[in-house]
Amino acid sequence: MRKVMNSPDDGNGRRRFLQFSMAALASAAAPSSVWAFSKIQPIEDPLKSYPYRDWEDLYRKEWTWDSTGFITHSNGCVAGCAWRVFVKNGVPMREEQVSEYPQLPGVPDMNPRGCQKGAVYCSWSKQPDFLKYPLKRVGERGERKWKRISWDEAFTEIADKIIDTTVKRGPGNVCMPKRPFAVITSAGYSRLANLIGAIKPDVSSMTGDLYPGIQTVRMPARTVSTFDDWFTSDLILMWHKNPIVTRIPDAHFLTEARYNGARLVNISPDYNPSSVHADLHLPVTTGTDSHLAAAIVNVLIADKKYKADYLKEQTDLPFLVRTDNGKFLREKDFNKDGSDEVFYIWDSKSGKAVLAPGSMGSKDKTLKLGAVEPALEGTFDANGIEVTTVFARLKAEIAPYTPEATHKTTGIHPSVVRQLAGWIGDCKALRILDGYNNQKHFDGFQCGRLKILILTLIGHHGTTGSIDTTYEGWVLEGNKALGGVKGRPGRSVSMVLAQWVWGEQYRRSKAYFDDTELREQIGFGVDEMEALRKESEANGWMPNWQSIKDPVVYINAGINTFATSTGYQHLRENFLKRCELYVVVDFRLNSGAMYADIVLPAATNLEKLDIRETSSTRFIHAFGQPIKPMYDRRTDWQISVGLARKIQERARARGITRVDDPEIKSFIDFDKVYDEFTMNGAVEKDEDALRFVMEKSKALGPGSYEEVLKRGFVGVGPSAGKTGPVPADKPYRPFTVNVSEKVPYKTLTGRLQFYIDHDWYQRFGATVPKPQYGGGVLGPKKYPFVYNTPHTRWGVHSFARTDQWMLRHQRGEPDVRLNPAAMARKGIKDGDQVRIFNSSGEFFAMAKAWPGLPENMLFSEHGWEQYLYKNMTHYNSVNAELINPLELVGGYGHVKFAAGGFNPNRIFHETTVDVEKA
């Protein structure tokens, strides 16, 4: 065989290359060389003209631009960062962070904000996976055969299918999930869904990002301080939170807090990049966090580290509970006409039970106790009914969970638990950064209640501390006015329950989980979960649209339904059987779009006019549309406008007018959809819709539209806070008015509520916050590895996961992390291709050694597209999910279905797998 010279394996070729390189370098240095640097004249007088400097001009021209504008990158990110974009010849060339945020006194500033994913957006948006034109499927679903069509063709087909489906099968068989994370974008899809009576799934539950346990304690559960408030803390618990990786724009506040004297504690099964910066790392065993939290509560109560006066006023802990049936003592217990929402406390001064002010049924809407001195503990006689207090019940039920008793379960030594509890009891400002991961475990519901109990016992909730879950957003009345339609509520559902039915996830979970093991651990199996789901729907607690409707027309805007759910292939196959027209709206061809019937190209972040509101900063950020939509893209608002116009046009052409919708006491005026959507043309244009939102929002108001486009951001006013005013001179902290102004909480008792006497909570032994079961992962024990899919440094969900620069900063392909000792046992080396599998499915990825992981754990960072995997598998192919019955409850004061608040969260980190070399 002829040998090719200069090949990588040819030693002579390498030597010849090096010899040539050295000769060239020497030649360049020689005075007679044409490469001689003597030709480049030094500048001695900057006012004079020098020849032979054209090479510098060429370089300078690379950095010239025609115009600039502002954008933010927030598809799935809870931050909010202003970037200035430089445009040349109508093309975005680069962008840089804005560093003009005003500084508050006494805390570090927010300048600049951003991360590497935002920095590459101009480059990423030019890659071939970004959509240019509307597409229609011409092959089988998933075959990836398309033809280009016009917007009119696309809108006509979609509009006719919506009308046909509604007329023939009734309203509610159109489903419109959306999560575009921009105000008028989101409002547009909501408004259209409301006008046509469509189903609006809660996608936060789909991704497992709800905090339903905390929602039983306070309303809302999902809220945070502005991130600069971290600096004011002296003890910060990063509980299943990895902010060094996932909160890059804000991680500096943690470092600055440490310089200010704060302690950082990392609680996570793995030793991660945030652990490096912590003063204490607790490697809690997966699925046992509630036991650790219970042990901390145990110590705080036993050592009397709680603030009694705070608990008496701000919580339901002094409320009276009957000893005979475990129910709250209510007004109706003494008066048949009394309220079921008025409760009692024991007044130590008068020695009798008195009505507690501030509850849902109370006429006294205040937490002020006046001369009443509530008892925290004791057993009393209330007119012949024996009662005790919630605190007494809590103390008794938490007593078994000592640090010594929980040691074997959690893996955390008692001395470490007591050390941490001591720090908590003595600190002045506790901050709990509560990550998403814990909520994706069955253990997460009760653990959430226990975490907020820790903060509450020491009196820091609403005072000096906070438990930060995830952003809730600011109060923007204009946003609600644009997205809502009076008398047209649409249909909200839990996406978890919808996919449980439509995707037949119940059948999949039943096949995967070991029924005997499950019953031994939690007391019931998947069959009971399904029965309880049906009972909840029959009781009217959870919406039942998934049980009586089908997603015949499914318009998926800004999310990837299959990639963000369990059992990728299983869900897709079963879901699509019910779906006759599957439409995807996105700015890039994600893996879910490969199975679509029609794909609509949405404008990129660079091409849209919109704003992003998130309560992690005190600013609203602009999608300032530095360039107009390129190719045949349209903004999301114009897509909604165009579809509404076509629905009205086709309805009039076909003689279809009003369709009654008695199930939700509403109607659909098909022949007026466009007129109603645009408010008779008033908000047809993007700029009109955005101005409408901003000028009708008290926290923004007149002039804010011009300012946000001029600066890239605009500050919010005091009324923006959902649980209290936004102060002008310090960071925002939620729930302060409940303490300072004695405003009741939006709970049944009007307090931070830790006792739920609902029948189901009594049935499952969960009236007070305590571990729901013995702890540990619930997946089949025959698979040796616990499987987890944490957030990544190199993307925001799927955002930037295909960018060439982000891929070059990692392995360039999907990987899984394993402890080196586990790899050695399996005969796997770093870089090997491996197969991860269980009875639910399989996927293939590159093995990556990760010493910070426990030996029984396997991580695969999420966000990867299906088409990046061998055999088109996916990291969610192996997951299976469970439903916690406590999350199915409704009809109990504040504990009821709420999109983005309370409904079944996706519990899919109970999965176990095995791994082998591929």
From Swiss-Prot:
<feature type="binding site">
    <location>
        <position position="73"/>
    </location>
    <ligand>
        <name>[4Fe-4S] cluster</name>
    </ligand>
</feature>
<keyword id="KW-0732">Signal</keyword>
<dbReference type="InterPro" id="IPR009010">
    <property type="entry name" value="Asp_de-COase-like_dom_sf"/>
</dbReference>
<keyword id="KW-0411">Iron-sulfur</keyword>
<comment type="function">
    <text>Component of the selenate reductase, which catalyzes the reduction of selenate to selenite and allows anaerobic growth with selenate as the sole terminal electron acceptor. A c-type di-heme cytochrome of the cytc4 family was shown to donate electrons to the selenate reductase in vitro. SerABC can also use reduced benzyl viologen or reduced methyl viologen as an electron donor. This subunit is the catalytic component that coordinates a [4Fe-4S] cluster and the active site molybdopterin guanine dinucleotide cofactor.</text>
</comment>
<keyword id="KW-0560">Oxidoreductase</keyword>
<dbReference type="InterPro" id="IPR050612">
    <property type="entry name" value="Prok_Mopterin_Oxidored"/>
</dbReference>
<dbReference type="GO" id="GO:0051539">
    <property type="term" value="F:4 iron, 4 sulfur cluster binding"/>
</dbReference>
<feature type="binding site">
    <location>
        <position position="209"/>
    </location>
    <ligand>
        <name>Mo-bis(molybdopterin guanine dinucleotide)</name>
    </ligand>
</feature>
<dbReference type="InterPro" id="IPR017840">
    <property type="entry name" value="DMSO_Rdtase_II_Mopterin_su"/>
</dbReference>
<keyword id="KW-0004">4Fe-4S</keyword>
<keyword id="KW-0500">Molybdenum</keyword>
<keyword id="KW-0574">Periplasm</keyword>
<protein>
    <recommendedName>
        <fullName>Selenate reductase subunit alpha</fullName>
        <ecNumber>1.97.1.9</ecNumber>
    </recommendedName>
</protein>
<keyword id="KW-0479">Metal-binding</keyword>
<comment type="similarity">
    <text>Belongs to the prokaryotic molybdopterin-containing oxidoreductase family.</text>
</comment>
<dbReference type="InterPro" id="IPR006311">
    <property type="entry name" value="TAT_signal"/>
</dbReference>
<dbReference type="Pfam" id="PF01568">
    <property type="entry name" value="Molydop_binding"/>
</dbReference>
<dbReference type="GO" id="GO:0033797">
    <property type="term" value="F:selenate reductase activity"/>
</dbReference>
<comment type="subunit">
    <text>Heterotrimer of alpha (SerA), beta (SerB) and gamma (SerC) subunits.</text>
</comment>
<dbReference type="Pfam" id="PF00384">
    <property type="entry name" value="Molybdopterin"/>
</dbReference>
<dbReference type="InterPro" id="IPR006656">
    <property type="entry name" value="Mopterin_OxRdtase"/>
</dbReference>
<feature type="binding site">
    <location>
        <position position="77"/>
    </location>
    <ligand>
        <name>[4Fe-4S] cluster</name>
    </ligand>
</feature>
<dbReference type="GO" id="GO:0046872">
    <property type="term" value="F:metal ion binding"/>
</dbReference>
<feature type="binding site">
    <location>
        <position position="81"/>
    </location>
    <ligand>
        <name>[4Fe-4S] cluster</name>
    </ligand>
</feature>
<keyword id="KW-0408">Iron</keyword>
<dbReference type="InterPro" id="IPR006963">
    <property type="entry name" value="Mopterin_OxRdtase_4Fe-4S_dom"/>
</dbReference>
<dbReference type="GO" id="GO:0042597">
    <property type="term" value="C:periplasmic space"/>
</dbReference>
<feature type="domain" description="4Fe-4S Mo/W bis-MGD-type">
    <location>
        <begin position="66"/>
        <end position="129"/>
    </location>
</feature>
<feature type="signal peptide" description="Tat-type signal">
    <location>
        <begin position="1"/>
        <end position="36"/>
    </location>
</feature>
<dbReference type="InterPro" id="IPR006657">
    <property type="entry name" value="MoPterin_dinucl-bd_dom"/>
</dbReference>
<feature type="binding site">
    <location>
        <position position="115"/>
    </location>
    <ligand>
        <name>[4Fe-4S] cluster</name>
    </ligand>
</feature>
<dbReference type="GO" id="GO:0043546">
    <property type="term" value="F:molybdopterin cofactor binding"/>
</dbReference>
